[in-house]
Amino acid sequence: MEQKIAIALKEIARGTNEIIGLEYIEKLVRKYYETNERFIVKAGFDPTAPDLHLGHTVLIQKLALLQQYGARVKFLIGDFTAMIGDPTGKNETRKPLNREQVLENAKTYEEQIYKILDEKHTEVCFNSTWLDALGAKGMIELCAKFSVARMLERDDFTKRYKENRPISIVEFLYPLLQGYDSVAMDADIELGGNDQKFNLLVGRFLQRAYGLNKEQSVITMPLLEGLDGVQKMSKSLGNYVGITEEPNAMFGKIMSVSDDLMWRYYTLLSTKTLEEIEDLKHGILNQTLHPKAVKEDLASEIVARYYDNDQAIKAKEQFSKVFSANLLPEILSESDFDEGVGILDVLKQIGFCPSTSQARRDIQGGGVKINQEVIKNESYRFVKGNYVIQLGKKRFMKLNIN
């Protein structure tokens, strides 16, 4: 029993930024092993962006891992706040949504998350269920439990206050509403990104303030680096792997990451145990395994997760054909640009190069091809049409210039 619990805690801690309340997590896991009683793990997701890439799945992978050790996952869609929108007006991606849009996006989430989560032990929730019912009296009672001084401890609020920049009252409500979610859901553990730590701790505080006989444990997860290994994975930066991408494109993108970044992906995305990952590292060190083969295993695992084993095998075969014969892949990821865009900007925006200076070096070194022709002109600009841009032997993307 003790060894099982130790292994569980080690796997739960894997890849995390911080865990607050580890002792409580140990208690929950122990109780599950002894009584088969599950505990509640909560994680909130933005209903405005249901199209997931691997960066989004870091949290979901951790939720799936926790399910193995007794978690009942409550996948929270913050529809109440989404229907308000961004009170500052600065975040254009957080425009107010109507109920129909929220439900449509939630449906898309469900189609994607059950490729990772055990549906039997997952419940999709909407915070409008309890926040709509809170009413004016309940909202005032909620606000009374937290001080402005405590709210100003949040870094971005502190900075704006010192710079005499406006902070909306509604912005103060966001952490309180998220924290109240933990009260309403009776959460034992809450997961979130490292940038959400303040809000997660508000939930812990409010559980005490509302008289719950618990304080939720908090697990914060890091942002996943994109394919360039420099910036966070992002669609806008072009350094992402979408979980609905074609298998060949998904496989090829994962194979394009550096050997160092591969281990980061193994830690945050693979279902292999830490012990199994260490065995792979030792295999490379003692030269019984080749890094390319280990990376192929990772790519195969991820493709199989979102498709199936047959598709993973075919994607591996296709990649091997391209890699060995320097052929063009049959299926490419695509990016759209306006006519007149320069090649340096394109290389940066699609995530092939982290900087303009690196893009220049790659062009000068003959590593950049357009439609299989080496480009040495760093002032090259695209006219209207379709192109295939290539960096090195393994990185390809289709460009649609409009």
Swiss-Prot record:
Top-level EC class: ligase
Motif 'KMSKS' region per record, residues: 232-236
Residue span of motif 'HIGH' region: 47-56
GO molecular function, one term: tyrosine-tRNA ligase activity
UniProt-annotated location(s): Cytoplasm
Entry GO terms, CC: cytosol
Domain S4 RNA-binding intervals: 341-401
Alphabetical list of HAMAP family matching this protein: Tyr_tRNA_synth_type2
Identification of the protein by name: Tyrosine--tRNA ligase
Lineage: Bacteria, Pseudomonadati, Campylobacterota, Epsilonproteobacteria, Campylobacterales
Gene: tyrS
